[in-house]
């Protein structure tokens, strides 16, 4: 049985978010590093460090929290995995969905690497829809 590393990463971030944790540690791979770099660039994460422990590399993520009068909340409200190993979802550049009218982002795996929906539309390429974040 194969592991869906993207789903595992999204679940770890979602659970840490709901639990109110500031940092979370996930296993490192090329695709997870690219997705995490994209989340950092889009402002959903505060910091990322690569950590070596017991012969394996891990990414230590610092989640971005904001303080309000009612308490703290995070920037990532929802993470939803779309394409999965049993059912891959592909889209052309013209049919990439807009999440909340452009407020959320769609992460795609393209021939040019891991891109957001805006970057893929600008380059005019489609690909596999990995997840929605809003």
UniProtKB/Swiss-Prot annotation:
InterPro entries: Ribosomal_uS8, Ribosomal_uS8_CS, Ribosomal_uS8_sf
GO molecular function: rRNA binding; structural constituent of ribosome
Localisation per UniProt entry: Plastid
Stored Gene3D superfamilies: 3.30.1370.30, 3.30.1490.10
Pfam families: Ribosomal_S8
Keywords: Plastid, Ribonucleoprotein, Ribosomal protein, RNA-binding, rRNA-binding
GO biological process: translation
Entry GO terms, CC: plastid; ribonucleoprotein complex; ribosome
Assembly information from the UniProt record: Part of the 30S ribosomal subunit.
NCBIfam families with a match to the protein in the record: PRK00136.1
Homology family: Belongs to the universal ribosomal protein uS8 family.
Role noted for this protein: One of the primary rRNA binding proteins, it binds directly to 16S rRNA central domain where it helps coordinate assembly of the platform of the 30S subunit.
Name listed for the protein in its UniProt record: Small ribosomal subunit protein uS8c
Organism: Cuscuta obtusiflora
